């Protein structure tokens, strides 16, 4: 078969970059970023380039498997797909019959290809759908909701046109988002300036004009000091604030105690540098982006950190502005029709959510949900029994804290099923493993991308599956057919795409040219239109959220100085890297070769005081939890911080490369399922202090 190029979408991390794949004889030969998409320009990160080695790897689930021993024992029976889907349908039917559809939890990647899976959960009669953002981004989402009345996915980071950018605990040039990285590089090339705030130096900080090596856990003090200066010096956009911001006087009272000098004592950042940054932001306004954070389940005040980042943008008139945070346009905003949704084919579910969102926590939204809250409620059957969990490309035992406790919780389920393309700690405990085809071997739904130029994006199958694996729509469609959801029982991707596109005026062949169909020729930057109202109680950006006040939650907090770790102890901090995305890439042949294990970053002076040398293996412990890991010493990490990349320390026998390599950071988080941000609802994964000792 002659070579051909297929436009598709990467699936190696949650960013999902548009790609083009050269295929010959039904085999993927070369993969690169989609050269026809602005800001991609053929670029692809290392993870994306490892998609072909993943397809060729034999150490992944190859066929449906039924557990034939104790959970975690590793004894499996191979099933046909007919047997596997029948088994899953039987187990789900039993749980629904005995406890109701609400007793099923579904943990999902979320994102633009998830509509059919969400509809399936609705068809089960369950309100308990959770996306990956419930672990990583819920504090950021709720911060936006409290201010604007909508989630942060309705805002665009216009990095390309920004003149001042602040990246706070966002290592954009290593934990790569190709489009945003290229846009930021374009901005810097055109005279834009970058400030990086982090507890250690990174590739991103090496590109910065200013680098603030901040004391871990003190970002809130920095942000409040910037707001204090903006208000006290009257550097904010007064006309914008008068029109679009509510409770500005109250914000002034809340920030009165956060002078740059107070922030310096807490953060270690000189007051003069805080003043200079604020002046520079005001000068560049409204073409300013203060990044609200990527993985924001860090501290018990991370909601406040995200919220103050958004507030700084708003005070500078950047919300709704080109070069700032313009509102994401939907197809309807440019005179087009959006995709049809599968959820509209089924009645809504009125049951209360197991995580308390919407009733116990009325301010929070059910989009991502609070998976940790739902799982923690299982032992007490509160608010009702939870008896089944289905995961789609998610690994709670590797992503959530305290997997020791969580394993015991999952043991109380009647049914645990995992739809996954790679082995995971959770799949190893499952009753049923349904192998998902790697993204190069499956097609997906059409995705709707809201933004300054709304578009539809299509993932096509590039090659036939090597093993007995299936696409997500095939698995969900097969289950739907067996459970009486005929409206979701699709038998071909073309039928799915036809349903989605009906009435939009877009045809399937329109994707042939470049894999993406833009719905407008000109970017839609705004500004905020006359008469526009934010969907908040006041119709404005609320410095004090009425919605949060009704739940008894604080919109902002007072200064709470952090304790300093004692000698030999460090605050455990986490972050991404350019090679791995949590745990599912660790056994990838290409990526493992380049980064086989994680290391623990320590400040070289702090380590010297303990007699620890670079490259040595040290012991780490928290309460009764302990492990070993190699250290990397640097002068460019805060002395109170210990940093590592999460996801390592795999225990799975099928993964010959990753098994036993590195340290699982989440195992050093005893009680972590119950340590949460009270105003945001998210986890606080960096509220753990570890002891490091020389061996």
Regions found by a protein language model. Give the residues of each.
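N-terminal export/assembly segments and adjacent metallocofactor-ligating motifs
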Residues: 1-233, 262, 270, 392, ...
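Acidic/polar loop patches that form or flank catalytic/metal-binding clefts of enzymes
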Residues: 29, 237-238, 274-275, 288-290, ...
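Flexible glycine/proline-enriched surface loops and loop-helix/loop-strand junctions
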Residues: 70, 168, 207-208, 257-262, ...
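Glycine-rich phosphate/diphosphate-binding loops that line cofactor/substrate pockets in enzymes
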Residues: 84-104, 155-164, 254, 275-289, ...
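A glycine-rich phosphate-binding loop feature that marks nucleotide/adenosyl-phosphate handling sites
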Residues: 109-110, 243-245, 325-336, 492-504, ...
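Extended redox/cofactor-interaction regions of prokaryotic respiratory oxidoreductases
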Residues: 116-197, 204, 220-224, 310-428, ...
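Glycine/threonine-rich phosphate-binding loop and adjacent beta-strand/alpha-helix elements that clamp
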Residues: 156, 440-465, 475-476, 480, ...
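Long, contiguous, secondary-structure-rich segments that constitute the structural scaffold
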Residues: 462-520, 588-601, 605-695
């Amino acid at each position: 078969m002659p070579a051909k190029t297929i436009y598709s979408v990467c699936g190696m991390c949650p960013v999902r970059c548009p790609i083009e794949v050269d295929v010959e004889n039904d085999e993927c030969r070369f993969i690169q970023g989609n050269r026809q998409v602005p800001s991609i320009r053929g670029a692809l990160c290392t993870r994306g380039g490892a998609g072909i080695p993943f397809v060729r790897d034999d150490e992944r689930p190859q066929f449906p498997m039924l557990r034939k021993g104790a959970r975690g024992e590793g004894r499996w029976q191979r099933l046909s797909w007919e047997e596997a889907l029948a088994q899953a349908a039987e187990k789900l039917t039993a749980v629904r019959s005995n406890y109701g559809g609400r007793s099923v939890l579904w943990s999902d990647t979320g994102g633009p290809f998830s509509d059919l899976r969400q509809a399936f959960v609705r068809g089960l009669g369950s309100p308990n759908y959770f996306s990956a953002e419930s672990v990583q981004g819920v504090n950021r989402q709720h911060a936006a909701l409290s201010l604007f009345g909508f989630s942060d996915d309705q805002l665009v980071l216009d990095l390309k046109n920004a003149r001042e950018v602040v990246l706070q605990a966002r290592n954009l040039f290593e934990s790569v988002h190709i489009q945003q990285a290229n846009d930021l590089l374009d901005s810097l090339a055109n005279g834009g300036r970058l400030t990086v705030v982090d507890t250690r130096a990174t590739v991103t900080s090496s590109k910065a004009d200013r680098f603030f090596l901040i004391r871990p856990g003190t970002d809130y003090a920095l942000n409040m000091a910037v707001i204090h200066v903006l208000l006290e010096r009257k550097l904010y956009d007064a006309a914008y604030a008068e029109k679009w911001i509510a409770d500005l006087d109250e914000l002034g009272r809340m920030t009165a105690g956060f002078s740059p000098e107070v922030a310096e004592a807490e953060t270690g950042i000189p007051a003069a540098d805080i003043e200079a940054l604020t002046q520079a932001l005001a000068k560049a306004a409204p073409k300013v982006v203060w990044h609200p954070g990527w993985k924001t389940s860090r501290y018990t005040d991370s909601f406040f950190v995200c919220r103050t980042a958004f507030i700084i943008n708003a005070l500078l008139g950047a919300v709704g502005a080109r070069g700032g945070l313009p509102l994401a346009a939907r197809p309807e905003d440019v005179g087009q029709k959006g995709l049809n949704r599968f959820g509209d084919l089924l009645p809504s579910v009125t049951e209360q959510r197991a995580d308390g969102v919407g009733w116990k926590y009325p301010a929070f939204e059910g989009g991502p949900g609070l998976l940790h809250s739902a799982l923690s409620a299982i032992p007490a059957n509160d608010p009702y029994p939870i008896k089944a969990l289905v995961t789609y490309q998610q690994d709670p035992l590797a992503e959530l804290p305290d997997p020791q406790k969580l394993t015991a919780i999952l043991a109380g389920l009647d049914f645990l099923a995992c739809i996954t393309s790679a082995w995971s700690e959770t799949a190893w405990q499952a009753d049923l493993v349904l192998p998902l085809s790697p993204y190069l071997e499956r097609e997906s739904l059409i995705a709707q991308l809201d933004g300054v130029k709304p578009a539809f994006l299509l993932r096509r199958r590039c090659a036939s599956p090597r093993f007995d694996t299936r696409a997500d729509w095939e698995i969900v469609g097969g289950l739907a057919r067996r459970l009486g959801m005929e409206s979701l029982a699709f038998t071909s991707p073309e039928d799915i795409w036809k349903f989605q596109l009906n009435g939009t005026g877009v045809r399937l062949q329109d994707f042939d040219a470049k894999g993406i169909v833009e719905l407008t020729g000109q970017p839609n930057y705004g500004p905020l239109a006359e008469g526009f109202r934010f969907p908040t109680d006041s119709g404005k950006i609320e410095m004090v959220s009425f919605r949060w006040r009704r739940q008894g939650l604080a919109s902002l907090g007072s200064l709470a100085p952090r304790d300093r770790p004692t000698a030999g102890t460090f605050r455990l901090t986490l972050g991404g890297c350019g090679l791995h995305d949590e745990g599912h890439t660790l056994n990838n042949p290409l990526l493992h070769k380049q980064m086989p294990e994680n290391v623990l970053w320590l400040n070289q002076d702090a380590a010297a005081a303990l007699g620890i040398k670079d490259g040595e293996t040290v012991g780490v412990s928290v309460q009764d939890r302990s492990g070993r890991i190699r250290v990397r010493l640097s002068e460019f990490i805060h002395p109170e911080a210990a940093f590592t990349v999460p996801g390592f320390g795999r225990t799975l026998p099928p993964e010959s490369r990753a098994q036993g390599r590195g340290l699982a950071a989440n195992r050093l988080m005893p009680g972590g399922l119950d340590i949460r941000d009270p105003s945001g609802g998210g986890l606080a994964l960096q509220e753990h202090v570890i002891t490091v000792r020389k061996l």
